[in-house]
Curated annotation (Swiss-Prot):
SMART domains: RNA_pol_Rpb6. The RNAP catalytic core consists of 2 alpha, 1 beta, 1 beta' and 1 omega subunit. When a sigma factor is associated with the core the holoenzyme is formed, which can initiate transcription. Coiled coil: none annotated. The lineage of its organism: Bacteria, Bacillati, Bacillota, Bacilli, Bacillales. One of its GO terms (molecular function) is bacterial-type RNA polymerase core enzyme binding. Promotes RNA polymerase assembly. Latches the N- and C-terminal regions of the beta' subunit thereby facilitating its interaction with the beta and alpha subunits. Its EC number is 2.7.7.6. This is DNA-directed RNA polymerase subunit omega. Belongs to the RNA polymerase subunit omega family. It is an enzyme of class 2 (transferase). GO terms for cellular component: cytosolic DNA-directed RNA polymerase complex. InterPro entries: DNA-dir_RNA_pol_omega, Pol_omega/Rpo6/RPB6, RPB6/omega-like_sf.
């Protein structure tokens, strides 16, 4: 079972694809700098820690105004 739940995460970020992108970028930052904002993360992996940061609202993103041309 995923902790935090996908439903909880999708309340914070509107799209599954955006959620994956934000979490992956943050996980990469954590691998390089070894800094986690959450006090006692449940997960020991960087992606899990990034998802916990998103769920705790310690990590946010600003959506780009650029739209893909259709």
């Amino acid at each position: 079972m995923l902790n935090p739940s996908i439903d909880s995460l999708l309340q914070k970020i509107d799209s599954k694809y955006t959620l994956v992108t934000v979490a992956a970028k943050r996980a990469r930052e954590m691998q390089l700098a070894n800094n986690c904002v959450v006090e006692k993360p449940v997960s020991h992996k960087c992606v899990g820690k990034a998802l916990e940061e998103i769920d705790a609202e310690a990590l946010s993103y600003v959506p780009s105004e650029d739209k893909v041309a259709e």
